[in-house]
Design a protein with these regions (language model features):
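N-terminal ligand-binding lobe of clamshell/alpha-beta domains
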Residues: 1-123
């Protein structure tokens, strides 16, 4: 569903979580790009509560990394309930446990999933 600027302002979301099935869109794109200046008064943008999902192929809605997707949405929507969890650390442990990879390999996987923003924002 594509929303107009007017529809977005009518909703005025507290949080925006960007999907990645049609291409990756980092939170910084909405927060910093002049292409989105008309949206700067939205609560989510003013409060810097814009997040991006991990990259996922269009045909993989229920892949093994699905718990990461759920955690990002939960922490974005309810930061006070998940303040003790850092997604960037959870992701490393997840990859090590699920795939049996080293710390360095887990970091490479996190980067491939385009989740380095979680480190940058300490999310």
């Amino acid at each position: 569903m594509i929303l107009s600027t007017e529809q977005l302002y009518a909703i005025d979301p507290d949080v925006i979580v960007l999907p990645t099935s049609n291409g990756y869109h980092p939170a910084s794109e909405l927060l910093n790009s002049s292409d989105f200046e008309k949206l700067e008064e939205l609560k989510a943008i003013k409060n810097k509560r814009v997040y991006a999902m991990p990259w996922s192929p269009m045909n993989c809605a229920r892949r093994v990394e699905y718990p990461i997707d759920i955690l990002i949405i939960a922490k974005a929507a309810y930061p006070q309930l998940f303040s003790d969890i850092k997604v960037h650390k959870f992701v490393l442990d997840f990859y090590k446990d699920v795939y049996g990879v080293s710390e360095e390999q887990a970091k490479a996987l996190r980067s491939e999933q385009i989740l380095d923003w979680t480190v940058e924002y300490d999310f």
